[in-house]
């Protein structure tokens, strides 16, 4: 665990209250997915994330990082970035080779997939906690705590055997320790500061209502769409007056291409119960001015046609009467 210097806390949390002043991401992590088809073919994908926002990719062909934002390097120099890229290149190549070499010893049956996540998180009060977890086929396999390999119960004897093997490689464990407990915290602070304008921006949501597929005879599905908001935390609820409707179903918060978010909230009701319902949206960007949209039964196509045709016919009738009356006056000698 690392404690932030006071000066950096003041930059990230200018209001003095870290729990409320900083509403952007608070963690950085890299994700590795390695797929092993057979003893000679493997593919690894990598990416870097601030919470749910991707800021790095990995080009497997060139073995270089892809920086998705101008500030994705944080405060690291080009030399430091090049050194890290070299570490990851060597690691990815060596990891695939070692796994294939030891697959038989660990009774690994092709094809299989290994996932890994490693990073660090800024906690309230300024502490930074680092983490590393590995999974095999979607099941927890091991973690690193206090620079030691800890097998997961789901990994069984295979995970225990792996940890016993890896701790013999002191050079690898020292590199992991440096990356987790020194490099990652320093990078996290730098990138949060470098990307501060983007990460702490406030973008107001847009909201609209629609009807979804009918859930059954005599019933309606009301849908409240909320899109384009940032940061991610949002509160959406179907209401009747001030009473929350407990049947409200929230979907997953999904990313838009422009680093904003989308959410939909649905409510199934009987035909006669939709009147008086509203969708309420709360978000930090609204500064307490909640969005409230009231449900109105959609107008039928027939009503729309009548609303257009009837006035048009009346207008034509008036014009015809005016024209006939004008002609009749002209025929008077």
From Swiss-Prot:
Glycans are attached at residues 38, 75, 146, 258. Residues 185-295 form the Ig-like domain. Disulfide bonds join 120-184, 149-163, 224-279. Residues 1-17 form the signal peptide. Its main location: membrane. Residues 18-303 are extracellular. Expressed on cortical thymocytes, on certain T-cell leukemias, and in various other tissues. Keywords: Adaptive immunity, Cell membrane, Disulfide bond, Endosome, Glycoprotein, Immunity, Immunoglobulin domain, Lysosome, Membrane, Signal, Transmembrane, Transmembrane helix. It comes from the Eukaryota. A motif (Internalization signal) lies at residues 329-332. During protein synthesis and maturation, CD1 family members bind endogenous lipids that are replaced by lipid or glycolipid antigens when the proteins are internalized and pass through endosomes or lysosomes, before trafficking back to the cell surface. Interaction with saposin C is required for the loading of bacterial lipid antigens onto CD1B in the lysosome. PANTHER family: MHC CLASS I-RELATED, T-CELL SURFACE GLYCOPROTEIN CD1B. This is T-cell surface glycoprotein CD1b.
């Amino acid at each position: 665990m690392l404690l932030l210097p006071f000066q950096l806390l003041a930059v990230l949390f200018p209001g003095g209250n870290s729990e409320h002043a900083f509403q952007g991401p608070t963690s950085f992590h890299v994700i590795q997915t390695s797929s092993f088809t057979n003893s000679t073919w493997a593919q690894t994908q990598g990416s870097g994330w601030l919470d749910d926002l991707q800021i790095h990719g990995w080009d497997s062909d060139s073995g270089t990082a892809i920086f998705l934002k101008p500030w994705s390097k944080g405060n690291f120099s080009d030399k430091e970035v090049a050194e890290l890229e070299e570490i990851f290149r060597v690691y990815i190549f060596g990891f695939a080779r070692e796994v294939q070499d030891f697959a038989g010893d660990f009774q690994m049956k092709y094809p299989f997939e290994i996932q890994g996540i490693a990073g660090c998180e800024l906690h309230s009060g300024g502490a930074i906690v680092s983490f590393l977890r590995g999974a095999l086929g979607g099941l927890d396999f091991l973690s690193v705590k206090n620079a030691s390999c800890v097998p997961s119960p789901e990994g069984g004897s295979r995970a225990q055997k792996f940890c016993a093997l890896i701790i013999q490689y002191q050079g690898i464990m020292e590199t992991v320790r440096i990356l987790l407990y020194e490099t990652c915290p320093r990078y996290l602070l730098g990138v949060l500061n470098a990307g501060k304008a983007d990460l702490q921006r406030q973008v107001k949501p847009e909201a609209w209502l629609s009807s979804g597929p009918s859930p059954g005879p005599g019933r309606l599905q009301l849908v409240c769409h909320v899109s384009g908001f940032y940061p991610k935390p949002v509160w959406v609820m179907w209401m009747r007056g001030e009473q929350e409707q407990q049947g409200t179903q929230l979907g997953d918060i999904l990313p838009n291409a422009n680093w904003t978010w989308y959410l939909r909230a649905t409510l199934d009701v009987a035909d006669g119960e939709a009147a008086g319902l509203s969708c309420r949206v709360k978000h930090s960007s609204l500064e307490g001015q909640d969005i409230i949209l009231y449900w109105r039964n959609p107008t039928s196509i027939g009503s729309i046609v009548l609303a257009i045709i009837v006035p048009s016919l009346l207008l034509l009738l008036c014009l015809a009467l005016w024209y006939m009356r004008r002609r009749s006056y002209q025929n008077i000698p």
